[in-house]
């Protein structure tokens, strides 16, 4: 644990391509140079109609519980989201429930390419009472609550990528 008691939780809500179920029922992660077991032992939630039911079973229920506890902490939190399209109501409901609590200090930072439009739930949240705590870094620019998009003066505007965010954190951003 860092000296300042800050921590980061990396929560893979739908599993990972490097998670496998061993014969004893434990989930383990394949590391570099490990031999990959059979693909049918992979622990993933695939995009299908039974996705919600699968999230109610371990190891996913444990991940979801950690997600819920992290969101509902009374401490200042940053929920940084990448690789998620905001298409799962059960996840969106948890985020919205946490953000809507008056005592909640969580800030949502969503990294989205979204070439067409911002997902409907994010559009709704931007206009809500907690909208100032909803930040969207997208191909169209940076949105902070109802404001935006703000674009950087640079020709190559790539906020929504790890490289772009790292650049902004390191060099600041001129809009």
Describe each PLM feature range.
Residues 1-45, 55:
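Extended, H/D-rich, highly charged conserved domains that either
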Residues 53-54, 65-175:
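SIR2/sirtuin-family catalytic core signature
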């Amino acid at each position: 644990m860092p000296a300042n008691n800050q921590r980061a939780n990396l929560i893979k809500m739908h599993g990972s391509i490097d998670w496998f179920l061993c014969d004893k029922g434990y989930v383990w992660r394949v590391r570099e140079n490990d031999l990959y077991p059979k693909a049918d032992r992979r622990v993933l939630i695939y995009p299908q109609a039974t996705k919600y039911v699968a999230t109610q079973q371990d190891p996913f229920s444990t991940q979801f519980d950690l997600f819920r506890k992290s969101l509902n902490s009374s401490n200042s939190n940053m929920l940084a989201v990448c690789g998620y399209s905001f298409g799962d109501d059960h996840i969106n409901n948890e985020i919205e429930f946490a953000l809507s609590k008056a005592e909640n200090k969580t800030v949502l930072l969503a990294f989205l390419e979204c070439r067409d439009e911002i997902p409907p739930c994010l559009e709704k949240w931007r206009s809500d009472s907690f909208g100032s705590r909803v930040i969207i870094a997208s191909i169209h620019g940076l949105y902070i609550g109802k404001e935006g998009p703000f674009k950087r003066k640079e020709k190559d505007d790539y906020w929504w990528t790890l490289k772009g965010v790292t650049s902004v954190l390191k060099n600041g951003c001129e809009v």
